[in-house]
């Protein structure tokens, strides 16, 4: 099997590049640049203003009109040639990497990975949060490891919503207007040489979808788009908005993803060895493959069993109520045209979507996926246990735990990365478990001065970025020049800084810190040992309680007592997240156990030597080692949620008062917190391998992909 799959595309737009710089187009139209800082530095050098505004190489190429000065700049030309040579080497030498070296030709085709969202970089905003960022990191790591891999998703021209917080703390919703020609997207080309389009039959009409390609290193990501002239005006918006509120529109999206995604691969001549469903949104791809086999003369049972053998499923939600469900009558109505045309028994298909609660009026996407895949996993060891207990009545095979990881080259900050590289570390090539011991050894060798200075550099970057964001935010609220001027003094790097940043679902308890306002105010405003806290996060437009949590935090941030010490940054995205995980001292996470399936933001923080303070849930249940962070509460939650909330808040305050604040402000003769630095080393050393996507993907290959490909 070739080490990567090549999908033919239409040519990149003509940016009138001189022949000596034509390689810039190859760089711009491959998301490789999103995790290789040297490429980003190259494009920033071409036009810093455009780069800072858009963070997109395509935007830089579109804006550039005169290349003469760059052609005559020998330093730039050397930089360009070096970057291009490294990129070409990366793309051409997959057989040097883990999959080819360890597993050779064990797969007869690629892994086809389906997900509703992908977080690759903020300039391509087709993600909402952790699921999409995980999918993006999964693709990047598959590329780095030269795993034969193709990903499938949807192109959301309006993206996920943009968040503003008004002067009263209410969340406001706006949307993008993404234009493909301004993004690193090219149309896939079918074997006839025409731009690829697929179709799905729905009641009374055919819906068409264009197929775009976002190249992610060696991995092609196919994105389906219904906003095409062939469609009725009522169908063009199907793929416009990620997690659109209307249930019927959402079901249309998931049919396009599952059914259309399979058809896109077929049209492009891709024959996957394994099919991976990342969450249940794409479960109709299983029905579509069964339909293909029924049309070839197989019985439905035989067809489903054949599909099942080569399909694997990752479940992300611990409780049944959090899984995707649709009205069974609506599913019947929308799938009837395809089912009737193929002779499939729609009642059998609907029965396989019966959830754990036995409610036949609902079609449960997770239940359907579990029944029709041969291997399934939760996204942490604890989540695997919880999922097994929840879904045992549904399936006859265990749900294993494969703990999520994150992609270190994407998430480790420049200063911390340099510290590791100065000691021989290489985040771009961590391909064996030997790296686990090497990272421990390297972190133990980092001098106090180097580690502390790197951390303060990343805190300074956060301060600069947050000041700009907050000033823009408060100016929109009509704050005075005096108040806006005071923002110059916020987020002092010499003050203990805590962050809580994630989706504002109520089970995550974002406002737990304010359970006892008087006590936390005393802690935060202590004149000798103050604390500053930065919040960020979105609540889904339909989640009114989550939006209420945002308003509560906002009101505390603008209160007389806490103003200037508590902040909430609006429009949480990958860029905000990078600055926070790289630039704070403590990463706070306090969900209700066991409702946090994984929680990868804490892993990103730990890799930057930021210390976690968290409930023992998700990844932290296995990642906590007593000396690499702090655990809030224990492992036996009280069924009385109010009592548990209060108990967790009290333990959080105790840890701050008795351990965290004293340790941070305990300085040696050089002004450095020695005990804190020791814990920082352990935080990074215990996460850089154990919670990397490299480790994660090795487990997917050996525990899921290869067994499924072999029919085991």
Enumerate the language-model features and the residues they cover:
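Catalytic cores of carbohydrate-active enzymes across secretory and cytosolic contexts
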Residues: 1-712
């Amino acid at each position: 099997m070739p080490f990567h799959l090549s999908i033919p595309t239409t040519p990149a737009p003509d940016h009138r590049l001189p022949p000596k710089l034509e390689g810039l187009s190859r760089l711009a139209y491959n998301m490789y640049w999103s995790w290789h800082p040297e490429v980003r530095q190259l494009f920033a050098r071409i036009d810093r203003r455009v780069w800072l505004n858009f963070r997109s190489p395509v935007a830089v190429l579109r804006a550039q009109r005169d290349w003469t000065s760059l052609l005559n700049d020998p330093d730039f030309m050397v930089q360009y040639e070096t970057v291009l040579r490294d990129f070409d080497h990366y793309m051409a030498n997959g057989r040097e990497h883990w999959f080819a070296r360890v597993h050779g030709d064990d797969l007869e085709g690629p892994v086809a990975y389906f997900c509703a969202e992908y977080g690759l970089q903020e300039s391509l905003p087709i993600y909402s949060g952790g699921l999409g960022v995980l999918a993006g990191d999964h693709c990047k790591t598959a590329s780095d490891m030269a795993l034969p891999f193709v990903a499938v998703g949807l192109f959301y021209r309006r993206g996920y919503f943009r968040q503003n917080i008004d002067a009263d703390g209410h969340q406001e919703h706006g949307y993008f207007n993404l234009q493909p020609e301004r993004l690193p997207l090219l149309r896939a080309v079918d074997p006839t040489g025409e731009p690829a389009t697929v179709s799905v039959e729905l009641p009374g009409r055919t819906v068409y979808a264009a197929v775009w390609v976002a190249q992610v290193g060696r991995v092609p990501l196919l994105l389906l788009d219904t906003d095409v002239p062939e469609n009725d005006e009522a169908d063009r918006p199907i793929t416009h908005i990620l997690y659109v509120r209307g249930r019927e529109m959402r079901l249309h999206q998931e049919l396009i993803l599952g059914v259309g995604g399979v058809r896109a691969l077929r049209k492009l001549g891709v024959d996957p060895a394994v099919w991976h469903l990342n969450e249940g949104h794409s479960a109709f791809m299983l029905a579509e493959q069964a339909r293909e086999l029924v049309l070839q003369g197989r019985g439905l049972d035989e067809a489903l069993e054949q599909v099942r053998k080569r399909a694997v499923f990752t479940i992300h939600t611990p409780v049944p109520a959090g899984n995707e469900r649709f009205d069974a009558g609506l599913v019947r109505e929308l799938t009837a045209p395809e089912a009737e045309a193929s002779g499939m028994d729609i009642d059998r298909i609907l029965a396989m979507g019966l959830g754990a609660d036995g409610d036949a009026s609902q079609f449960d996407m997770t239940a359907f996926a579990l029944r029709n895949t041969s291997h399934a996993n939760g996204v942490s060891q604890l989540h695997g246990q919880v999922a097994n207990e929840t879904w045992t009545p549904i399936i006859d095979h265990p749900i294993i735990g494969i703990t999520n990881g994150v992609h270190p080259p994407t998430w480790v900050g420049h200063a911390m990365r340099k510290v590791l590289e100065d000691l021989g570390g290489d985040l771009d090539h961590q391909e064996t478990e030997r790296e686990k011991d090497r990272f421990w050894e390297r972190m133990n060798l980092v001098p106090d001065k180097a580690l502390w200075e790197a951390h303060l550099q990343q805190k300074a970057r956060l301060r600069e970025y947050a000041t700009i964001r907050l000033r823009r935010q408060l100016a929109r609220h009509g704050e005075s020049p005096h108040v806006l001027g005071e923002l110059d003094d916020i987020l002092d790097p010499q003050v203990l800084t805590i962050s809580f940043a994630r989706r504002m679902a109520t089970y995550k308890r974002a406002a737990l810190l304010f359970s006892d306002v008087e006590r936390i105010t005393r802690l935060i405003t202590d004149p000798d040992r103050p604390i500053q806290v930065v919040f960020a996060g979105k609540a889904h437009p339909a989640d009114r309680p989550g939006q209420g949590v945002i308003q509560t935090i906002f009101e505390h941030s603008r209160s007389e007592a806490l103003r200037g010490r508590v902040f909430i940054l609006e429009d949480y995205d990958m860029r905000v997240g990078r600055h926070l995980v790289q630039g704070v001292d403590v990463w706070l996470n306090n969900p209700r156990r066991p409702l946090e399936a994984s929680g990868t933001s804490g892993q990103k923080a730990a890799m930057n030597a930021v210390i976690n303070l968290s409930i023992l849930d998700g990844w932290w249940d296995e990642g906590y080692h007593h000396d690499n962070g702090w655990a809030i509460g224990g492992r036996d939650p009280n069924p009385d949620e109010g009592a548990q909330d209060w108990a967790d808040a009290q333990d959080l305050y105790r840890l701050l008062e008795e351990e965290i604040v004293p340790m941070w402000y305990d300085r040696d003769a050089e002004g450095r917190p020695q005990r804190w630095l020791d814990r920082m080393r352990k935080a990074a050393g215990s996460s850089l391998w154990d919670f990397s996507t490299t480790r994660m993907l090795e487990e997917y290959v050996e525990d899921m992909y290869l067994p499924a490909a072999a029919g085991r």
